[in-house]
């Protein structure tokens, strides 16, 4: 068992024995997460929460838009006409920008554009998904992946273009407690990709998260998505750029483009279908002699509660029967059994993500991979 060094407070082991599978999830695990709270159908409250918990201090443009919509009954009514799962602020805002909205903090100007171009925005919303594919989330996954004996078969559910399936192809610069840095680089990349194409992922490892000393030995890259994105398709690449938040393009667009190039040169095996129904098939495709690692980042909030419960049941069984390891990086309240194990102060912060291995919370993390912090349990 590997422990995190650090304070005198009792810290959870970063990697408890990974087999058998996750702790049993309760049958009533069906009501956590901002997507499923009591006011999920209240557009005003949903956008107010988005402003308060998700974008404050991160993107002034989206903060202004979300606050404006929260206080704008006519625009709330417009958005309420969308299917519930399509009312997500990130999706509506990305669709508006994709349709040509200026990235302005002037809410009145944004409102005028949104109402004037609603038919186009609505069509984009209905035909696209929030498939944010942030390769930097690999920096959050790597400390845990590097502790699993290889070789590994990675299975990402909700994979989008599959950019998080290449943790061994990226370079990393970790900042440790005290300010020291640790760098990791791939020994070699696919022959069709030059080493300079590997993006460098910066991440702070806080409160004793150990710096990975090696990149994982990945022998299979697979997954499931309702609408897998072709990393070589120009229109798909343009949509992924629209999903990047205003003010973050200078850092994230070059990283996205580099990661898409890596994926296009060595495409993953992503099954088109429902992640609940197809997770077993994705694991069955893993080669013998490898450890299947089923993982997901910021995905389960887009499932209805019964589907989320069924997914947990199935992945739990895969861990027990197929020797799989399950890594979840999700909003703090999305998995009841995970949320029950973290301090109340953390549960109150809807913007926090929790990293759990086999249903056991081990760390909190930034949603886009800026930092990961060892979880202190009382």
What are the roles of these predicted feature ranges?
Residues 322-330:
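Conserved beta-strand signature within the Rossmann-like core of class I S-adenosyl-L-methionine
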Residues 1-34:
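N-terminal amphipathic/basic-hydrophobic helices that include classical n-h-c signal peptides
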Residues 310-321:
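A short glycine-rich, Lys/Arg-flanked "PGG" loop and its adjoining helix->strand segment in the class I
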Residues 77-149:
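Class I SAM-dependent methyltransferase Rossmann-like catalytic core
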Residues 82, 101-102, 132, 149-156, ...:
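Class I S-adenosyl-L-methionine-dependent methyltransferase module
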Residues 334-378:
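C-terminal region signature
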Residues 292-305:
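A short SAM/SAH-binding and catalytic strip from SAM-dependent methyltransferases
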Residues 30-81:
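Non-catalytic accessory regions outside enzyme or core folds
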